[in-house]
Amino acid sequence: MAEEAYPLFQQAVNLQPQVDLFQANLASCGVFLGKISEAKAIYTRLLKRFPNHQRNHYQLARLEKAQDETHLQQMLKVLEQTNNPPDRNIFIYFAIAKEYEDLGRWSEAFEYYKKGGDAVCSVARYDVKEDIELIDTIIRCCNKEWLNEPVTAAENSSEPVFVVGLPRTGTTLCERIISSHSEVETLGETLFFQMILRRESGVQSTQPISREMIEALLDKEPAAIAKGYMEQVAYRLHDKAYFIDKLPFNILYLGFFAKAFPKGKIVYLHRNPMDACFAMYKQIFTWAYKFSYSLED
């Protein structure tokens, strides 16, 4: 959707160039389209106006490999002058860490990655035990016997392809490769399948998915799940034979996907666990994948 959004952000900037949020959105969208030099110019210009804006420092640091300490020293100065508590420094911690890593200063890089991760953990209210219990429930419920039970499959004009795996394992690259085929389109990362599972389970919960939902879904008609999902994505489809949904968290729901879409495809990306975990540890996912901010989790 970045192709459609970019000219709209350009129009917003042209109409109100003094609004820094419009310019930041234009730069962020441009990164998705490979407009790196344009994005760099925007972030550099914004930081001249707002030198303490941590998120813009973070976005600028991500654009290219640091060749010297110029930007790094600017960020260290911001950190020293603002004197914020750790949970207000998350973006600049990760930005500083990234540039230290670019410069081969490994111990300093790890120090700041840890500061960033610890700061997120201090406010995240996350307990890894809950995720482990959910995964154990899925393994117990979505077993071989259940998967082999006969089902009535829904007929669809377009079949889904789930591209799944931990973040930073190559799901985005895989999505781009597959979607380059003329008979494939991509929806990007959506929550549609999870939403349908929540609805069909009939379980009321504040959790995105719960053990109770998983257990309740075992007796639900896979065809109803397929129908509900296809109704949700219909407005995004354009008469291609296949479409991709690449939300990494869909890996939890592959059993229900396999039963709902016997003709659907699953592409699972696997990467060396150490590489995958450390790559996640270095990334800000906003409030997703809370386990990634602690090496213990």
Model-flagged regions — what are they?
Residues M1-R236:
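Alpha-helical solenoid repeat scaffolds of the TPR/TPR-like class and their adjacent stem/linker regions
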Residues L33, L187, F192-F193, L197-L218, ...:
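PAPS-dependent sulfotransferase catalytic domain
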